[in-house]
């Protein structure tokens, strides 16, 4: 392998959603260099940061019936029981909820936590309060997905935050997704909630760091053997 290929292999790809932002920062940086060189270097640093924000690295997803993987990079901020958003149709009883908070330094491409069929997608506008607060799940802008699996339905909710002002979805209702498959993105810091059926065993703890598509959040069936992995 050549040196250039070796370097390229170490640099994660950029998601196309980031191209307009990176291009905009780069253009502003060029203008700032023309006006005042130190400002141009500041603009260059911001351009690099923007490129890092939209990075989309390959992930190796554990493949086995019943596994639930992390849908986002970040910190497990809360594990509790809570009512799922009414628009998902998951019932009116509290379900187990695992929340992942994403800072502006995390990868923000979101991945499906399970293999299944997307039964419903519902977008709801709202506020932009701190995504770490519990009430953010009710008050903030959100995009909710109900995914049907052989073990029951789960809910995945993308929640906007103080900085995040744009939720992007790559999927549609009726589409079949695999565990770890990309389904959306939230720009510049946010949170994801996963609602799990009763009886699911949670395998993470609050404060733990999660890696989208790789960290196993929970297991529907701990007795099932045969764990394999897939890069995607």
From Swiss-Prot:
UniProt keyword list: Cell membrane, Decarboxylase, Lipid biosynthesis, Lipid metabolism, Lyase, Membrane, Phospholipid biosynthesis, Phospholipid metabolism, Pyruvate, Zymogen
Key word Membrane present: yes
Membrane topology recorded in Swiss-Prot or TrEMBL: Peripheral membrane protein
GO molecular function, one term: phosphatidylserine decarboxylase activity
Location within or outside the cell: Cell membrane
Catalysed reactions, semicolon-separated: a 1,2-diacyl-sn-glycero-3-phospho-L-serine + H(+) = a 1,2-diacyl-sn-glycero-3-phosphoethanolamine + CO2
Cofactor notes: Binds 1 pyruvoyl group covalently per subunit.
GO CC field: plasma membrane
Active site: 190 (schiff-base intermediate with substrate)
Superkingdom classification of source: Bacteria
InterPro entries registered for this protein in UniProt: PS_Dcarbxylase, PSD-A
Enzyme class: lyase
Cleavage (non-hydrolytic), annotated site positions: 189-190
Keyword Secreted appears in the UniProt entry: no
Pathway note: Phospholipid metabolism; phosphatidylethanolamine biosynthesis; phosphatidylethanolamine from CDP-diacylglycerol: step 2/2
Cofactor: pyruvate
GO biological process, one term: phosphatidylethanolamine biosynthetic process
EC number(s) per entry: 4.1.1.65
Record PTM: Is synthesized initially as an inactive proenzyme. Formation of the active enzyme involves a self-maturation process in which the active site pyruvoyl group is generated from an internal serine residue via an autocatalytic post-translational modification. Two non-identical subunits are generated from the proenzyme in this reaction, and the pyruvate is formed at the N-terminus of the alpha chain, which is derived from the carboxyl end of the proenzyme.
Modified residues (Pyruvic acid (Ser)): 190
NCBIfam families (UniProt xref): PRK05305.1-1, PRK05305.1-2, PRK05305.1-3, PRK05305.2-5
Function: Catalyzes the formation of phosphatidylethanolamine (PtdEtn) from phosphatidylserine (PtdSer).
Family, as annotated: Belongs to the phosphatidylserine decarboxylase family. PSD-A subfamily.
Assembly and binders: Heterodimer of a large membrane-associated beta subunit and a small pyruvoyl-containing alpha subunit.
HAMAP family: PS_decarb_PSD_A (MF_00664)
Protein name listed in UniProt: Phosphatidylserine decarboxylase proenzyme
The organism of origin for this protein: Bradyrhizobium sp. (strain BTAi1 / ATCC BAA-1182)
């Amino acid at each position: 392998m050549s040196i250039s290929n070796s370097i390229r292999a170490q640099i994660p790809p950029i998601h196309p959603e980031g191209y307009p932002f990176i291009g905009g920062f780069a253009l502003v940086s060029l203008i700032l260099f023309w006006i005042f060189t130190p400002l141009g270097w500041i603009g260059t640093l911001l351009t690099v940061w923007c490129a890092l924000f939209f990075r989309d690295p390959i992930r190796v997803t554990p493949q086995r019936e019943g596994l639930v993987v992390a849908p986002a990079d970040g910190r497990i901020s809360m594990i509790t029981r809570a009512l799922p958003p009414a628009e998902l149709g998951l019932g009116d009883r509290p379900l187990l909820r695992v929340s992942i908070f994403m800072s502006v330094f995390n990868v923000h491409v979101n991945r499906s936590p399970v293999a299944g069929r997307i039964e419903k997608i519902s977008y709801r506008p709202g506020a932009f309060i701190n995504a770490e607060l519990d009430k953010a799940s009710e008050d903030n802008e959100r995009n909710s997905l109900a995914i049907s699996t052989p073990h029951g339905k789960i809910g995945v909710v993308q929640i906007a935050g103080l900085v995040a002002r744009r939720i992007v979805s790559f999927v549609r209702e009726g589409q079949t997704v695999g565990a770890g498959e990309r389904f959306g993105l939230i720009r510049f810091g946010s949170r994801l909630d996963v609602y799990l059926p009763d009886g699911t065993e949670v395998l993470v703890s609050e404060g733990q760091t999660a890696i989208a598509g790789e960290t196993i959040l929970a297991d529907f069936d701990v007795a099932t053997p045969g764990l394999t992995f897939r890069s995607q």
